[in-house]
Amino acid sequence: MQLNSSSFHPHHFTCDTTRYSEEQVACICEALSNDARKLSQFVWTVLERDEMRNNQYILKAQAFLAFHSNNFKELYRIIESHHFASEHHLPLQEWWLNAHYHEAEKIRGRQLGAVGKYRIRRKYPLPRTIWDGEETSYCFRDKSRVLLRDWYCRNSYPSPREKRELAEKTHLTVTQVSNWFKNRRQRDRAGVPEPKDCLKDISEEEDLKLIRKTASKLSNSFHNPSDLSSYSAAAAAATFPGFYMNYNDMMIGAGTSYQSL
C-alpha cells in the first residue's frame, strides 16, 4: 500500500483508526515523517488502541517527535525502555547522539568539535536497545581507507548495492561504510579543507592520538614544566604539520582556526 502525506487530512486521524493494520500504520508513519504536525496527530490517535502502544513504528515516531521538540528526556526514556529492531537503529542512534550533543552545546555555550563529540559518545554510549553490540571502529585499515577515498572521489553517494560491495572489499559493515560517506560529505559541506587527491582523512581517534603524542613530545622536551607555555605554535607545527597546541588554555587548532576542547 503506497501512501504519502498529501493523502491525509487531519480530520482523517479523528476517525476510526482501527481499520488500519499494523503494516498500514507503519506506512503512514513513514509517509508522514516529514510533517511533524500530521504525524503527531496520527500517533496520538493511534495510541488509543492498546495493541499499538508497543508498535515499533509508533514508538519510533514518538521518539522522532520528542527529538524535534527538544524533549530529550522523553526521547531517552523511549529508547532505553524499548528494544528496537535493527532496521530502526540508525535513525534512533543519530537522535540519541545529536540530543546529547545539543545538551552539551547548550551547557557550554558553543558548538562541539570532533574531539568534543568523541567525548560525548564515550560518556553516553548507545543503549543496547538500539545497538547490536558491534563496536564501531573509527580507525580503519589503510587499505580500507584508500578504497573508500578512491570511491568517494568518483561518487560520494554510493547506492545500497555499491555500499554492500564496498563493505565486502573493506571488511567493514554496511553501516560503517554508510557512516563514513555521510561523515565525509558533512566535512566537505562544512568546508573542512581536503587535498585535491582526496588522500587526507584523519579520524577522530587519530586526532586524539596525535594530540596525546604532541603533548608527550612537548612535556619530554623541557625539564621545567613552565617552559611548555613558551613552546611556540610553529615548533609544534613543525613536529606535527597542521596542528598546534596552546597549553595556557588547552586550545587545539588546525590551520588558521582553532576550537577549544
Curated annotation (Swiss-Prot):
Q: Report the Pfam families cross-referenced here.
A: Homeodomain, SIX1_SD
- InterPro entries cross-referenced by the UniProt entry: HD, Homeobox_CS, Homeodomain-like_sf, SIX1_SD
Q: Which organism is it from?
A: Caenorhabditis elegans
Q: Name one GO cellular component term.
A: nucleus
Q: What is this protein called?
A: Homeobox protein ceh-33
Q: Which GO terms describe its molecular function?
A: DNA-binding transcription factor activity; DNA-binding transcription factor activity, RNA polymerase II-specific; RNA polymerase II cis-regulatory region sequence-specific DNA binding
GO biological process terms, semicolon-separated: regulation of DNA-templated transcription; regulation of transcription by RNA polymerase II
* Superkingdom of source: Eukaryota
Keywords, comma-separated and alphabetical: Developmental protein, DNA-binding, Homeobox, Nucleus
Assigned protein family: Belongs to the SIX/Sine oculis homeobox family.
Keyword hit for DNA-binding: yes
